[in-house]
Structure formats: C-alpha cells, structure tokens
Amino acid sequence: LSDDQFAGSTFDYILSNPPFGREWKNEKAKVEEEAKLGFGGRFGAGLPATSDGQMLFLMTAISKMKDIDKGGSRIAIIHNGSPLFTGDAGSGPSEIRRHILENDLLEAIIALPNDIFYNTGIATYIWVLSNKKAGTVREGKVQLINANEMFVKRRKALGNKRNDISKEDIAEITKIYGDFKESEISQIYDDEDFGYTKITVERPLRDEEGNLVLKKGKKQPDTSLRDTENVPLKEDIKEYFEREVLPFAPDAWVDEKKSKVGYEIPFTRYFYKYEAPRPSAEIMAEIMDLETELSGSLEEVFDL
C-alpha cells in the first residue's frame, strides 16, 4: 500500500485476495499523501478506516485498469462482508462504493460458502469489476449470486477450512454469472438501487410552556429530537418525507444542507427468506405431549 510496485502499469485482468481486517496505520502517512493526488493516484475516491485496509487494495486494482479504448480490464477480488456496507453516507467506504457504482464498474458480487479459508470461517465475497459494461446487457446493472450453499464437505478439516468448492460448483457458478438471468440464487439490480440520500429531520425547539423558540424569527431545531432517514435514490425525497415522517411528526422539516448521498450493498437482505412461525395450536399440542411424557416419567421414578 505504501509502495506501489506497479506504478504506471495497467493490466487486462487483475486477481486479488487481500487480507481481511488488516490495519494500515503503519502506511497511513504515505497513503494519505497519495490520496492528496486525487484520481492521479490510487486512492482518489476516499479512504477507509485505518482498522481495515481491504478497500485500499480494491482501489489499487481499479487504478490499474486499462482505458476502454485500450481494451479495458476485468477484476476479481475477494473481500469479507465489511466492504459491502461499512461506513455511513459521506464516509470513505461509502464514497468508494459510490465511485464504483456511479461509474458502473461493478458487474457482480458472488457470496462464497463459509469455512473455505484456512485462517477464518467468515463469509466472503468475490467482487467482479469491469469497465467494459457499456453497450452490453450488464450496463447499469449489478448481479448478486448467492453461492453460499455450493460446496462439498472436506473429509478432514484444515484449520478453519472445512468446505471445498468443487469443479462442478465452480462450473455452475460460472454458468449462472454468464447467463445473467434471475433465479433463486441470482438477482439483478440497477446500480442506483444501492444508493440512498441520508436526510436530517429536524423538530422545533420549544420552551417549557410548549411555545416555539425563535431566533431572528426562525424556528430553532431541537437537537434532542433530531433524527435521520435513508431515502432510496429512486424515491422522491419530498414524497417520502410526506408519507413516512409528517404523519408522525407534523412539525418536522428536512435540513437540506445536511443531506448526503451514500451507497451500501446489504447482500444478505436481498436473499432473506421469511419463514412463518409455527401455528400456536401446533406448539401447544407439542407442549401438552411433553407434559404428558414428563408426567409419565415422574410416575415411573416414584414407583421405583
């Protein structure tokens, strides 16, 4: 991170498996110095927290992409879940996601099975990026593939590695990616679906008698009542505010100067399946059966 070994170089294909959750405090000075170069360096979009440098590797890969008039590039990089959603609107991670999505660089994210790495069993994801989407069916789209259940158990674990992705699974994942169709484990979204505007909702400050506190004739916000809402980019903020806020707080208003655009990819939410709770009658019948069984067991004990 502190010493670009491929300065000025670009590549057709880039594969990367950066460390998960690795601090970059030791490289902070040089990284921040390069960030001042904007997109003339590797880190123009923003900087993540020093506790996790994954997205610095992601931006490094993006900076090595060939211009589209020279054939463009494709990237596959493995991350844990953190780069998908960490960071509020306006933060470094959110701004990095914003740069990727608003420039239509993200082709797909593939959720891998747990327990496929020696040192960790956490969830991991392959990000597939390309600057060659324009004019194709993928233009303006992102494909999410949930391959979490596509694995075979190892006969013997190696550290945390208990599962393998078989050749057949790899072929199937590749086919799903190539087909670019929606299914139970493949969903397709617009780039904009992952964006939102974080609005600040204010309520007026009132005195002990409930009267408005005014300053130069203007209502003053009560900071103790301040709240925020994330409004999807595809929604009109005014309509959202009138529907979701005003019915519950008729005196509220939006401080537009504080609005910020953010991006996140809550992957698991898109594949969540609601499971209805068991009927109460079924649960009660099971409890009665257990009580009957317990009563019989107690009788046997005391008969002894």
Model-inferred region functions:
Residues 1:
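Phosphate/diphosphate-binding loops
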Residues 4-299:
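A conserved structural/catalytic subdomain of Rossmann-like adenosyl-cofactor enzymes
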